[in-house]
């Protein structure tokens, strides 16, 4: 869990500094999360630099105006406080902007992947919510208009 939080911190720092690449220590879980990030289009990719020390280089992704796609990365379930969702709740759960990573008996999956898998099963399977990623998709001009509208 500490390695994942270190990776999240390195990604956040890299995004704030507008870096194109950050280097972190890897593990099996780190590779799972990074491949999921890559599949969802949140990073450009990652590459193993050194196999002996498990050094991984993460290539960050930005929009054309150099704003990041990620607005916040949060580790939800920690050792003492774990958050679980039942399978029936997962089928009715449709977040708009956030991306949820859920640990189930199928491994670490995003919410849409797990919902798709649950459609094929007779009894839906739930899991533990591990991470919540807030995606920065709102256009800044639209955001300003919404603020002005709320002020009136």
Swiss-Prot record:
Superkingdom of source: Eukaryota
Compartments reported by the entry: Mitochondrion
Any one Pfam family match given in the protein's UniProt record, by short name: Ribosomal_S8
Keywords: Mitochondrion, Ribonucleoprotein, Ribosomal protein
Chief localisation class: mitochondrion
Any GO MF annotation of the entry: structural constituent of ribosome
Family recorded in the similarity comment: Belongs to the universal ribosomal protein uS8 family.
Organism: Dictyostelium citrinum (Slime mold)
GO terms under biological process: translation
Protein name listed in UniProt: Small ribosomal subunit protein uS8m
